[in-house]
């Protein structure tokens, strides 16, 4: 699949199973992610790979966030499901350095977001479906500690990666660009 087709047909797929990327494929995914736009060459992000037994640890961390934020019993069950939705989960932390005036925090956050998107595209290009998960639970104290976050850092994604149980339909809904583009 050429790059433009990949970009214009990418879709999330929440129904994932094994296999996940192997070590060589994962290395390529990270190489692609680290080519994200990055003013100041800061690489303001960190990736945490979870698979096998560490998915049980993720479940514990997500459940702790549900309790911490009093999100209720339904979210507690969702946390259990979420941690085991895919054979591999990659946590993404935006590592923000507020002391760099030349590259403000918002710009560092954008770079981390672009790296996450690059990670998704590289996985998709190698035949792996994925979905970017976020929400209040990524702000849980236990999860942030496990991911090595400093106060200024933000967990911006839990990217679930695996093989689609059902192939995500490549026909994406048509988006009229006129609603989003203005020419001066």
Swiss-Prot record:
Query: Which cofactors does this protein require?
Result: FMN
Keywords from the named record: Flavoprotein, FMN, NAD, NADP, Oxidoreductase
PANTHER family named among the record's database cross-references: NAD(P)H NITROREDUCTASE YDJA-RELATED (PTHR43821:SF1)
Q: How does it assemble?
A: Homodimer.
Query: Which residues does the annotation say bind NAD(+)?
Result: 122-127
State which Enzyme Commission number(s) the record gives.
Answer: 1.-.-.-
User: Which residues are FMN-binding?
Assistant: 10-12, 35, 39, 132-134
Please tell me the species this chain comes from: Haemophilus influenzae (strain ATCC 51907 / DSM 11121 / KW20 / Rd)
What is the name of this protein?
Putative NAD(P)H nitroreductase HI_1542
Q: Which domain of life is it from?
A: Bacteria
Concerning InterPro entries, the annotation shows:
NAD(P)H_nitroreductase, Nitroreductase, Nitroreductase-like, YdjA-like
Q: Does the keyword Flavoprotein apply?
A: yes
> What GO MF annotations does this protein's record show?
oxidoreductase activity
| Entry similarity comment | Belongs to the nitroreductase family.
- A Pfam family per the record: Nitroreductase
Q: How is the cofactor bound?
A: Binds 1 FMN per subunit.
Q: Per its UniProt entry, what is the enzyme's top EC class, as one word?
A: oxidoreductase
